[in-house]
Curated annotation (Swiss-Prot):
Keyword S-adenosyl-L-methionine: no
Keywords recorded for this protein, A-Z: Host cytoplasmic vesicle, Host membrane, Membrane, Transmembrane, Transmembrane helix
Species for this entry: Human enterovirus 71 (strain USA/BrCr/1970)
Parts of the chain that traverse the membrane: 23-45
Cellular component GO terms, alphabetical: host cell cytoplasmic vesicle membrane; membrane
Keyword Endoplasmic reticulum (UniProt): no
Compartments in which it is found: Host cytoplasmic vesicle membrane
Topological type in the membrane: Single-pass membrane protein
Protein name: ORF2p protein
Stated role: Facilitates virus release from intestinal cells in vitro, possibly through the host autophagic pathway.
């Protein structure tokens, strides 16, 4: 079985926070969680929550850019 410490490097690979919740449920049921383990899980969830947080449309300069040349037709 994978330990929680082994999951930390894969926090971005895990993806959406819903996946993290599933992993948390896996470990809560089968292993006693220490304080260090809880901090590690909290850190993984925070990383992914920030990654998937909705962004403001004003923060993306590419959306506000006016195209100067027409797009080329696909070949």
């Amino acid at each position: 079985m994978v330990t929680i410490k082994e999951l930390l490097p894969y926090s971005y690979w895990i993806g959406h926070p819903v996946s993290n919740r599933a992993i948390v449920y896996l470990f809560v049921g089968f292993t006693p969680l220490t304080l260090e383990t809880l901090h590690t899980l909290n850190y993984i969830i925070l990383l992914n929550t920030k990654r998937w947080a909705p962004r403001s449309p004003h923060s993306d300069p590419a959306r506000m850019r006016i195209p100067t040349q027409p797009r080329k037709a696909p070949l």
